[in-house]
């Protein structure tokens, strides 16, 4: 359900930002939007530290990718609900008008600057790993620098894909980048447990060539293809091997190459 109300008066919180909307997608997934600090400048794909105070008044902070693009007036986040998670056990209950802590110091490797120029850009994500790509899919630079953008998103069930599906659908009608996206963005969602028209792990669909066949495109080529990866540790490791088998090399902000991996969230109890 969507909630939207006028912004409430600020409480005394360090780096406080006010929640402007909350949506629960499944019993384990939710997204929310907050006010944006006037001083915050970030590149689409980066993350910030957000949090809440615990019972003793101490901040519980975790890294969260900004799911909204750099041009958005608000900030959006997409989160899993962990019942016993130090932060998400509290964060999942936030309501419009309440506040969170947001440290306005964005960082991250999933930025276009960390890739060499190319023709095709792949976003490879599992679960809430789609968050940085929710930002990048709405980033005009992605479509100005690449001829094609391919979003591969794998979840266990169809319901868990809904956040990404609705985002891609809305992009087509977006007044700012709808025309840029047209004909360039390809969306390839898959499930790993529930029956769906596309099934299987991203690594398997890439390694077998099934995704290329389904989309009617050429296989990966280090001369033309660039990729960004965000998921669990096991996913990151496995997909890196597949990308390397196609001749792509891992890069970084300081040394742009053919693909980059976000490792900030791996193994983090949330």
UniProtKB/Swiss-Prot annotation:
Disulfide bonds listed in the record: none
Keyword entries, A-Z: Cytoplasm, FAD, Flavoprotein, NADP, Nucleotide-binding, Oxidoreductase
Top-rank taxon: Bacteria
Pfam families: FAD_binding_6, NAD_binding_1
Record-level GO BP terms: cellular response to oxidative stress; heme catabolic process
Molecular function terms, GO-annotated: ferredoxin-NADP+ reductase activity; nucleotide binding
Subcellular location: Cytoplasm
Catalytic activities: 2 reduced [2Fe-2S]-[ferredoxin] + NADP(+) + H(+) = 2 oxidized [2Fe-2S]-[ferredoxin] + NADPH; reduced [flavodoxin] + NADP(+) = oxidized [flavodoxin] + NADPH + 2 H(+)
UniProt keyword Lipid biosynthesis present: no
EC numbers on record: 1.18.1.2, 1.19.1.1
Name of protein: Flavodoxin/ferredoxin--NADP reductase
Highest classification ranks of the organism: Bacteria, Pseudomonadati, Pseudomonadota, Alphaproteobacteria, Rhodobacterales
């Amino acid at each position: 359900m969507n909630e939207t109300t006028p912004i409430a008066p600020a409480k005394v919180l360090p780096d406080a930002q006010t929640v402007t909307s909350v949506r629960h997608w499944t019993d384990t997934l939710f997204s929310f939007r907050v006010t944006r600090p006037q001083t915050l400048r970030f590149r689409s794909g980066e993350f910030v530290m957000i949090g809440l105070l615990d019972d003793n008044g101490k901040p519980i902070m975790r890294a969260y990718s900004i799911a909204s693009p750099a041009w958005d007036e608000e900030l959006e986040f997409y989160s899993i609900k962990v019942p016993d998670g130090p932060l998400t056990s509290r964060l999942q209950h936030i309501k419009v008008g309440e506040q969170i802590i947001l440290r306005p110091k964005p960082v991250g490797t999933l930025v276009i600057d960390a890739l060499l120029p190319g023709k095709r850009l792949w976003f490879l994500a599992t679960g809430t790993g789609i968050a940085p790509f929710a930002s990048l899919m709405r980033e005009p630079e992605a479509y100005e620098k690449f001829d094609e953008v391919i979003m591969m998103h794998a979840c266990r069930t169809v319901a868990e894909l809904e956040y990404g599906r609705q985002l891609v659908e809305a992009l087509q009608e977006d007044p700012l980048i709808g025309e840029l996206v047209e004909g360039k963005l390809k969306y390839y969602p898959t499930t790993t447990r529930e029956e769906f028209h596309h099934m299987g792990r991203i690594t398997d669909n890439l390694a077998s060539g099934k995704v290329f066949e389904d989309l009617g495109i050429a296989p990966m080529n280090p001369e033309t293809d660039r990729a960004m990866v965000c998921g669990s540790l096991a996913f990151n490791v496995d997909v890196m091997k597949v990308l390397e088998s196609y001749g792509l090399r891992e890069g970084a902000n300081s040394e742009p190459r053919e693909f980059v991996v976000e490792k900030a969230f791996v193994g983090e109890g949330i």
